Amino acid sequence: NDSLAWAGDSLGAAVDTIGPPLDLDYGYKGFMWGTPLGAIPNLQYMSKPVFIRDSTALEMSGYLGQEAVVIEYVFSDSGFWKVEIKYALDPSDYESHLELFTQVERSLSEVYGFPQTTDRIESGAMGVHDVVNIGFERAFYFSSWNVSPVKISLLLNSIVQVPKNDLNVFGDDMSIMNLVYYNPDYMIMAEEIIVEEPPPSIFDIY
């Protein structure tokens, strides 16, 4: 059971989400790189976009296959430059985090080939961290692809409390898994020009 696959599609969500590799030359799912802020993207199976981050990004939520996600379209002074897909994770299921990363990475690799870079760091719950014997299982997974002019990065930062229970000391937001497509050609922010006023004359001070 591939939880990332659309019904009737043998590839995973990455394939169904991004389309053919050459699409990235133009934009993301038909939304062109450099499109100015104010244009509204439209993705199937997603909610209506809403502005966030002081209106410099659009956010929508929905499902990719069976996975709940939030998708952000982010704009710079040069226009649309990044899509960030944030996966919903079970805060107490460490193994499901690793499995989901592997599934998405596999789907991306079917489209773009093996990752250009990979990084894997895991740490089991060692020792006693406080008086109630709480520890943490941790994993940092990262893979990236270079699909010129676009960069693709997949990141998992998993931190799960052990022993598992319904009450997490640090809440349910310690783990994240994000998939990012970005075009460095549009990562441009206009520099604010600061006009410095000359210091007051010594005669004005004294």
Explain the meaning of each model-derived region:
Residues S3-D54, D90-Y206:
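Non-cytosolic coordination micro-motifs
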Residues S55-T102:
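Mid-chain, structured segments of secreted extracytoplasmic proteins
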